[in-house]
């Protein structure tokens, strides 16, 4: 039997999803939608695009009427904001909003869409985690009036988020600014504080 039995069982082709992401993290963006309920119980839809390598939110918009055109235009503007440096891959789920028109415009930048499996939010874990952070640290603590108000709040929070240390970046901030701990203890009077979102958060730095 040993003569006819294969020495090794056949393995599945290709690499694991986690391995693929790790190998291409600096070339990959991820996109997803989430909902926001206003003070008047209107449902708004926020669209977020995340650079996985930098953990940077490259685009975040809010609209009462989500569409493929809105999603595609958000991607285009994100690429232009990066001086035409488009990612190699874009991860998104199977929502019908990512239809032929969306994929065509994304492909025009040389970007390949990677569609996650059905009912598998963990396949877009980086984006899901950022959305969770936006909810817990921002939206769950404010009353949103409308889409313009939601965008203003989120823009202010994103500026704060991009400037604080991130564990996934070895305690460096997503905005790329090099952060180093002080060589010696800083006296309390040497620390300045900046209020974020009316005091919901505070950003700290060394006073000039």
Predicted regions and their residues:
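Charged DNA-binding/catalytic regions of mobile-element recombinases
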Residues: 1-208
